Amino acid sequence: MTRVVLAAAYRTPIGVFGGAFKDVPAYDLGATLIEHIIKETGLNPSEIDEVIIGNVLQAGQGQNPARIAAMKGGLPETVPAFTVNKVCGSGLKSIQLAYQSIVTGENDIVLAGGMENMSQSPMLVNNSRFGFKMGHQSMVDSMVYDGLTDVFNQYHMGITAENLVEQYGISREEQDTFAVNSQHKAVRAQQNGEFDSEIVPVSIPQRKGEPILVTKDEGVRENVSVEKLSRLRPAFKKDGTVTAGNASGINDGAAMMLVMSEDKAKELNIEPLAVLDGFGSHGVDPSIMGIAPVGAVEKALKRSKKELSDIDVFELNEAFAAQLLAVDRELKLPPEKVNVKGGAIALGHPIGASGARVLVTLLHQLNDEVETGLTSLCIGGGQAIAAVVSKYK
């Protein structure tokens, strides 16, 4: 079977809600990365067979945001593109689709990833197409409803985390401790420049003066403690334990990678970073969607012909501290190998981009001693996706 390799992998900094990227469309964030990858690899843009990009909150951006990003990123009009929506798994699903297209021989070179600007998601006025006869009308927050609400139960993703808290007996202190550790690891990594190789700075033009250059993730917080987090009120139910402090944020960002057949990489003298070994997807009861990575991880390992003990580093999306703690109850992961640079609680969770973001961060950790990695994300609606990669040899 054709070996599929990852030849370049980058991400933007992750902006906080209403932060540096509030006026930057998702497709511009994606275009920045496409342009950078072309420049870094020296690849002829016309040699790219397809562009596949995850994006959840598409309303108001225009037709097919992936196509917009591709064209604005400097690709010729002959290169096709399409947009993927698998909620939080969109970015990783896009990479899986690229992988599948190469294995089947349909493509040789694909740009794949994810992008999201949650700050720009519009408010919707449903049923207003033909006007209102009388009475009060309300707006729907597309970010909350299309991105963060379980449509089957009509409640916020945070309630699915609370459901896992009850099922697995997870304490508030456990969650807050997990969140603090995520922040501390991210602070250390940021201060030591450990994200520098994966981040492409984004220049934001200003009406007056020089452009602003965004170089670092905005959500990383110093001086966070369990004591401080313990003062926060529950965010989703009166007697709950999930708070804004032990959950991922609402964020803006993008991540992208160059997916190729090994033969094409050799032909073009492009040195790959890693080999894609296999993927797994799984579904569960939507009310406990956060536990779905257990099944996805098991399937990805089986398809990659690996055991959990073979994995040197894990990058697992931290939708909620409770969610990842529940997954750990089942998989019993070695803590020293999990999210060693911090996770989404600290870095942020731009939903359509996160699937690619966790893989980008993982790839930049591979070396002669850290050769095999696994990444996974839970997905609203009761799903999950996982992938296993190995350092290219």
UniProtKB/Swiss-Prot annotation:
Its EC number is 2.3.1.9. One of its GO terms (molecular function) is acetyl-CoA C-acetyltransferase activity. It catalyses: 2 acetyl-CoA = acetoacetyl-CoA + CoA. The active site is at C88 (acyl-thioester intermediate), H349 (proton acceptor), C378 (proton acceptor). InterPro entries: Thiolase, Thiolase-like, Thiolase_acyl_enz_int_AS, Thiolase_AS, Thiolase_C, Thiolase_CS, Thiolase_N. One of its GO terms (cellular component) is cytoplasm. This is Probable acetyl-CoA acyltransferase. It comes from Staphylococcus aureus (strain N315).
